[in-house]
Regions:
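Hydrophobic alpha-helical segments at protein termini of multi-pass membrane proteins
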Residues: 1-402
Length: 402
């Protein structure tokens, strides 16, 4: 053992040295600093636009639908669960980084377009010209960071859709605060209620849908072995996100230019639901179908890579079957919670997640996927050691694993 390196009994770590792990910690600290600075910037931006009372009311309205949509998104994350800190990071990027950057670039682009096209034409076309490019790029950058810096977690299409949708959800939440603040200032609670139904209810999944397309492309790139597809998939996903965004924003702009007069009630109950049916629902169906295909591939990885682990004793036969049966796994976790409380539930969940992580770590090695040296992920043997430790702890607690 090299001098100064701490002893980690019973756990085999990758070959990365202290400097590798130092780089990882430095990157995490830098990311935390970015979130902190952009959070302050976003709060200052909102604080200069609206009084505190308006921010509180509109902030509550913008936050209300978030748990519902987050639950729908996380429902897609079935078999190979993503770490909570990365899910939160994706959401925060959309909420404080992408919105802050997009606000100022969109504002600058609108000024330029006004000077070139005139106020009427620019007002109608700017949301369809600049917003899709600026916003999908600022949101998509979070997915690029995850793709390159979290290779051990960003494994496939399902992961890409989940991370992308959470980035979009964070973006939509803060964007809604701005829109809600404007209409609340002008029209009070009646105006806020109107826009809440339009943006948070009828079209609340639009931004998650857009960025989910980018994530799906990157996720497919991660799992394919074809060089052409690996390069083409992210580009297709990114352009699909921008195209859908442009169509969504451009519909209203074209109606404005055409001179068609639409009443607020028609806009709320006909136009927006109609746009959702035409643009949103088919695209969401496609993403869900991609996710379902991704589930099947995840099941194959788990079953193929853990077959020999049953013989080794790392995974029991019953656990092997549980890992690809979400209903039964949930039932066992509920039983652990009812009999042994949060500690037993957490320990059993940890066992199941480590077993699945072992399967995907083996799959990465089989595909020749190289992880960054600073990414302190356990080796295959390290996962086996850790699983044995957790199993012993569960046995000592009297928790049945299956």
């Amino acid at each position: 053992m090299s001098p100064g390196r701490p002893s980690l009994p019973n756990i085999t770590l990758p070959s990365g040295n202290l400097s590798d792990r130092g780089i990882r910690h430095l990157m995490l600290a830098a990311l935390g600093g970015v979130f902190f600075l952009f959070s302050i910037g976003t709060l200052i931006l909102l604080g200069t636009k609206f009084p505190l009372g308006t921010l509180i009311v509109c902030g509550i309205a913008a936050i209300l639908p978030v748990p519902i949509y987050a639950a729908l998104i996380l429902w897609l994350d079935r078999y190979e669960k993503e770490p909570a800190f990365l899910l939160v990071a994706a959401f925060l990027w959309g909420a404080v980084v992408a919105t802050f950057v997009s606000y100022f670039i969109n504002t600058g682009a609108a000024v330029v377009l006004h000077s070139i096209l005139g106020p009427k034409l620019a007002g109608a076309l700017s949301p369809a010209l600049s917003a899709p490019i600026v916003e999908e790029t600022s949101k998509g950058f979070a997915l690029l960071l995850l793709y390159f810096l979290a290779k051990n977690e960003f494994n496939n299409v399902v992961d890409g859709i989940v991370y992308g949708a959470l980035v979009g959800l964070g973006f939509a939440m803060v964007e809604n605060i701005i829109y809600f603040g404007r209409i609340y200032t002008a029209g009070g609670m009646a105006g806020l209620g109107y826009l809440f139904v339009m943006r948070a209810v009828f079209s609340g999944l639009i931004h998650p849908l857009f960025t989910g397309c980018t994530g799906a492309g990157l996720g497919y790139s991660r799992e394919t072995t074809s060089g052409v597809r690996k390069l083409a998939a992210p580009v297709i996903g990114y352009f699909a996100a921008m195209m859908l965004h442009a169509l969504w924003n451009g519909t209203g702009g074209l109606l404005d230019l055409s001179g068609v007069q639409i009443s607020p009630m028609v806009a709320l109950f006909v136009l927006v639901p109609g746009m959702m049916l035409i643009y949103g629902v088919p695209s969401i169906v496609v993403l869900v179908m991609l996710a379902k295909a991704g589930w099947k591939r995840e099941i194959v990885v788990i079953q193929e890579q853990l077959k020999d682990e049953v013989k080794r004793g790392t995974v029991s036969e019953t656990e092997y079957n549980l890992l690809t049966n979400t209903r039964e796994r949930f039932r066992h976790l509920v039983r652990a919670f009812s009999k042994h409380g949060p500690t037993g539930w957490l320990a059993l969940r940890s066992l199941y997640e480590m077993q699945v992580d072992l399967a995907f770590r083996k799959d990465q090695e089989a595909r020749g996927e190289k992880l960054p040296s600073y990414d302190a992920v356990l080796t295959v043997d390290g996962f086996r050691e850790r699983i044995g430790q957790v199993r012993k702890r569960l046995s000592d607690m009297g928790v049945a694993t299956a």
